[in-house]
Each structure stands twice: as structure tokens, then as C-alpha cells.
């Protein structure tokens, strides 16, 4: 909005934006609304095999999206989950050692893995919603084949989940008492 520091203007803008999304992409709107909590998002990630993570890069004013397969088990309820970017061929990673996979998970450059913070609002959409809204991404057959390979390789998935569960994420010391209020996350997260 033009009113950079006007909260009411921001709210009105968001309301109008959501109305437009609901009008143009009703199924995506429904997916947005039904995945606002961590639990509902994780349940959504369990139901489908292919999602797209969308980004707007402000510096270059470009958008980008990558297809991914969520790596979850039935007990996954962590704040971060690993996803595999389906632009990469998973067969190239199945035989890597635990240490090699760990290095890839810790690296963001040239890695097929990303870590999603599921306790935050994420710009993702499922392939099934895209199809219902008549939006067919390129290379869909390739993504389906790769997702199937990942889904069938439970040993690989378990290795990735184990690596992620053993990560130690940095925690920063709070210098002021006010900073400690939400230092362990929000109660509903």
C-alpha cells in the first residue's frame, strides 16, 4: 500500500487481496484458509506428495517457485521439516552416506533439501489444488515420478528425518527480560 506505516490500510489491503484470490483461485483460497495452523499444515503436507514453494524476490522483482516432496513420518510434529526439491533427481542422493546427507541438509547452496518452518505462514500450494484450479506446471510427469521414488524409499526418508531431528538449531541469549516472553515460541505453536 501507499501508506507504509498504516496498520488499518494494510488490513484493508489484505482483505481486498484475499477477496481477489478467492474470486480467481477459489481452491487455493480454501487451501490457504485451512492450513493456517501448524497441525493443519502438517496434515495437508501428509495428504499430498507434491507442493510448490513460491517466493517473491524483492531485489530483482521476480517470482520463483520450486516443487517439493515433504519428508515426514507419522510422528512428525517438529517446528521444521525437511523437503526435497523435485527439480533434483532423488536417485542421485539415495546412496549417500549419513554424513554426506547431513552436509547437504546443513547447506543451502546446490542442495536438494530445504527446511521449512511449519510454525510460520508459508507460501506453498499443493499440486492437486493447482490441477483443480486448471494450472498445470511444466515437468509435472517428472515431478510425479521423483515424488514416487521418494515416497517408496522409506529408509532414505527415515535417514533424513533422523538427521533433522538431531540438528541443534541456534538459540540466542536474551539480554532483556522483555525478550524472554516468546523465547520458547508461542503457546499455540
What residue ranges belong to the model's regions?
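DEDD superfamily 3′-5′ metal-dependent exonuclease/proofreading module
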Residues: 1-189
Amino acid at each position: 500500500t501507499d501508506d507504509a506505516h498504516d496498520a488499518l490500510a494494510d488490513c484493508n489491503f489484505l482483505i481486498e487481496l484475499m477477496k481477489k484470490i478467492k474470486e480467481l483461485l477459489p481452491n487455493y483460497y480454501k487451501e490457504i484458509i485451512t492450513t493456517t495452523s501448524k497441525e493443519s499444515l502438517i496434515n495437508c503436507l501428509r495428504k499430498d506428495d507434491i507442493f510448490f514453494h513460491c517466493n517473491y524476490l524483492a531485489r530483482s522483482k521476480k517470482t520463483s517457485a520450486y516443487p517439493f516432496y515433504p519428508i515426514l513420518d507419522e510422528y512428525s510434529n517438529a517446528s521444521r521439516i525437511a523437503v526435497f526439491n523435485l527439480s533434483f533427481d532423488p536417485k542421485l542422493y539415495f546412496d549417500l552416506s549419513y554424513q554426506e546427507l547431513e552436509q547437504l541438509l546443513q547447506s543451502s547452496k546446490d542442495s536438494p533439501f530445504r527446511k521449512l518452518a511449519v510454525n510460520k505462514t508459508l507460501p506453498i500450494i499443493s499440486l492437486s489444488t493447482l490441477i483443480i484450479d486448471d494450472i498445470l506446471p511444466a515437468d509435472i510427469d517428472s515431478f510425479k515420478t521423483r515424488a514416487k521414488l521418494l515416497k517408496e524409499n522409506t529408509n532414505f526418508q527415515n535417514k533424513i528425518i533422523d538427521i533433522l531431528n538431531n540438528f541443534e538449531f541456534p538459540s540466542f541469549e536474551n539480554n532483556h527480560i522483555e525478550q524472554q516472553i516468546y523465547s520458547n515460541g508461542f503457546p499455540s505453536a
